[in-house]
Amino acid sequence: MAKEKFNLQDRFLNILRTKKIEVKVYLVNGFQTKGIVRSFDNFTVLIESGKQQTLIYKHAISTILPAEYIMLMKTEEEQQEQQEAEQE
């Protein structure tokens, strides 16, 4: 079985996007914005707040603060279920 590569940044942003969790994004210049992560790629994050969209370059981001706790790692039970599914 090949070891699954774990990309923390992509996983974090994808959970925020799929669960539509509100975030505060702090930029390196001190500016901050709030909204929902709508999309992201290797270089940018698209934040939506109301009817306003903001495309932010990742190199300009200092901190992303989600409104709720994000479970990044799979629990042992989820890992076991995945292994069983792969064996079938």
Curated annotation (Swiss-Prot):
Species whose genome carries this gene: Fervidobacterium nodosum (strain ATCC 35602 / DSM 5306 / Rt17-B1)
Family annotation (InterPro entries): Hfq, LSM_dom_sf, Sm
Quaternary organization: Homohexamer.
Source superkingdom: Bacteria
GO molecular function, a single term: RNA binding
Lineage: Bacteria, Thermotogati, Thermotogota, Thermotogae, Thermotogales
A cellular component term, taken from the record's GO annotations: cytosol
Role description: RNA chaperone that binds small regulatory RNA (sRNAs) and mRNAs to facilitate mRNA translational regulation in response to envelope stress, environmental stress and changes in metabolite concentrations. Also binds with high specificity to tRNAs.
Pfam family, any one: Hfq
Gene name tied to this protein: hfq
Alphabetical list of PANTHER family matching this protein: RNA-BINDING PROTEIN HFQ
SUPFAM superfamilies: Sm-like ribonucleoproteins
Keywords: RNA-binding, Stress response
Family label: Belongs to the Hfq family.
Ranges where the Sm domain occurs: 10-70
Protein name: RNA-binding protein Hfq
GO annotation (BP), single: regulation of RNA stability
